[in-house]
Amino acid sequence: IRDSFLTYWTVFMSTLLNLEPTMLIAAIFAVLHVIFTLRVGGYRFSNNISLGDGGDKELLNRIRGHGNFIEQVPIALVLLLLNDLNGLSDMAMYTLGGVLLVSRIVHYLMITTRSLPMVLRPLSMIGTLGTILVSAFLLVF
């Protein structure tokens, strides 16, 4: 009985802790967070602005790009983790994570550089909020 319990427990724990999709997605977003933070901090340092935006439009855009990222990504990552723990397929996890990643990068670029077609900004929010809503829906149904 002891050996069968240990075998069952080992299989259960290895399945439960098989969170590669979430770990990869979270790691990518962690790197983006550091990059976006350094873009704000570096600009502050080079322009001697320690608090607020100092009336600098470029700094304001960088602050809001980073802030919007921080406002949206944590809840999405929590929902993705819960779906991963709930057994959502790796393909579905990578699809949701990929949509979120592309959406967040495009949205950040739209806020900070405005170098992409304006139609992409609302589309990037649709991708972000869609990922959040689909992830929530999958947890309930």
Task: Show which residues each predicted segment covers.
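Juxtamembrane boundary at the C-terminal end of a transmembrane helix
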Residues: 136-141
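N-terminal signal-anchor transmembrane alpha helix
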Residues: 20-48
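Interfacial loop-to-transmembrane junctions
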Residues: 106-130
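Mid-chain, well-packed structural core segment of small domains
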Residues: 76-79, 83-109
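Cytosolic, membrane-interface loops and tails of multi-pass inner-membrane proteins
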Residues: 38-64
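Core segments of transmembrane alpha-helices
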Residues: 68-80, 132
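Physicochemical signature of membrane-embedded alpha-helices that form the seven-helix bundle of GPCRs
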Residues: 25, 63-66, 96-99, 124-127
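Short, Lys/Arg-enriched N-terminal segments with co-localized hydrophobic residues
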Residues: 1-13
